[in-house]
Amino acid sequence: MKRILLLASVLLTTIGIAQTSVSFEKIFYETHSREQKYNIQGASIANGKLFQLHDGNKPIVVYDMRNGDFLTEINVEPIKTWHNNTACFSNIYYEQGDSYPLLYVSEENIKEHKAVVYRIKETKEGAISAEIIQTLIFPEPIEMGLYYPNIAVDADAGFLYLTGFSWESWNKGERGNAVQILRFRLPSVKEGPVIKFCTKDILKRFCSDFKVATQGAAVRGGKLYQVFGGPGNSCLVCTDLSTGAEVFRSELNGIPGEPEGLGFHNDRIIVTCNEGEVYRSDLIVKGN
């Protein structure tokens, strides 16, 4: 019965999806990440700077959005199981006077079903560092009915969202496997360095049809923007977080490779790719 209800929910949230067309142009190449042979994953943007994360928790690489210049490399503790699949800046500052808001990063791993919150600091001389100030631990995937959790934050509404799959597969749509979106409250960093969620903390669950490989995600204006897929089989999906309905989906026109990170800059969607290309959308997205 539970499976029947889930399938019904999938059908309800996908009826009437607007097919639209969003095109992308390449704006620069992440030379440093590729030279270091880092496996590019989630990314986010703040203060005109792109913060690129990598698999295995390799250093965070910072680029100038104006010209793609490499600015610096932030050393963090390398951890093989940390995938860093999604990253998103909030609009919350740890302390008044901080240059950057808190950065939320999902480890997106069956064993590491958690996210970490970074405080990014910059000195007057321009040196940038990152410190983990909070760890968010989510229920076991089998308990919450969501595998490969990716985090996206809506700080304005006070929520965090996890996206993932109802079965332990990110590339097969069999057995009713579907994309899940779970809503949790967004805890304050003042609540402590470790927050453990349980299944009763799930405030809302939305379901959508299966799409291969959840990739970068971010929230703007009450809508979740997320890229899916790999080379030749990728798309951008916009979901209304008040209803769970998909507003539109589009092929990633102009992006031949695998999308990884997603952020916003000057009201445009920015997508970073596994091979180092950085793309900008022709779609204008207003909001915070």
Please place each PLM-identified region on the residue numbering.
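Surface loop/turn motifs at the tips and blade-to-blade linkers of beta-strand repeat domains
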Residues: 30-36, 75-80, 137-144, 204-210, ...
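Loop/turn-rich, solvent-exposed surfaces of beta-rich toroidal or solenoidal domains
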Residues: 199-241
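Blade-loop segments of beta-propeller domains
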Residues: 68-108
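Structural signature of eukaryotic scaffold interfaces centered on beta-propeller domains
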Residues: 39-46, 83-100, 145-158, 166, ...
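Conserved blade-ending motifs and adjacent loop-strand segments that build the rim/top face
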Residues: 245-265
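Beta-strand-rich domains and repeat architectures in extracellular enzymes and scaffolds
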Residues: 28-58
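A short helix->beta-strand "capping" segment at the edge of beta-propeller domains
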Residues: 19-37, 197-202
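Structural motif
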Residues: 57-62, 110-121, 168-185, 232-238, ...
